Amino acid sequence: MLRITLMVAFAFGAISPALAAGGDKAFGEYLSGECVTCHLPSGRQVGTIPAIVGWPEDSFIAIMQSYAKKERDNQVMQTVAAKFKDDELAALAAYFGGLKPK
């Protein structure tokens, strides 16, 4: 299923090949410091802040890209998402996608 999703994303230009190659989980953990100030690594939701643990990598990347392009409304997330390069988004997606809710 993931393979089909990625092929469709490539076809429509939603995800670059660099992102789909998969990220470095250790690098993602290193980069996650700012994320976990609001999004708990335990997978619990806090108020209106969504849990991001266990998200599919392609969904995580697509959502972060839409924040960076200001297609989704949240000034904090727009600012945070715009900071990351493709390899960093892939690493974050791999890290959070690989965590299991506690």
Residue ranges and their predicted role:
Residues 1-4:
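Positively charged n-region of N-terminal signal peptides that target proteins for export
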Residues 7-8, 18:
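Cleavable N-terminal signal peptides
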Residues 14-32, 48-50, 61, 66, ...:
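Electrostatic cytochrome c docking/interface patches
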Residues 27-30, 59-62, 76-79, 91:
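Extracytoplasmic/secreted proteins, especially bacterial periplasmic and envelope-associated proteins
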Residues 33-42, 92:
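The canonical Cys-X-X-Cys-His
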Residues 37-40, 62, 69, 79:
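Regular, well-ordered alpha-helical segments
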Residues 46-53, 68-100:
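Axial heme c-ligation environment in periplasmic c-type cytochrome domains
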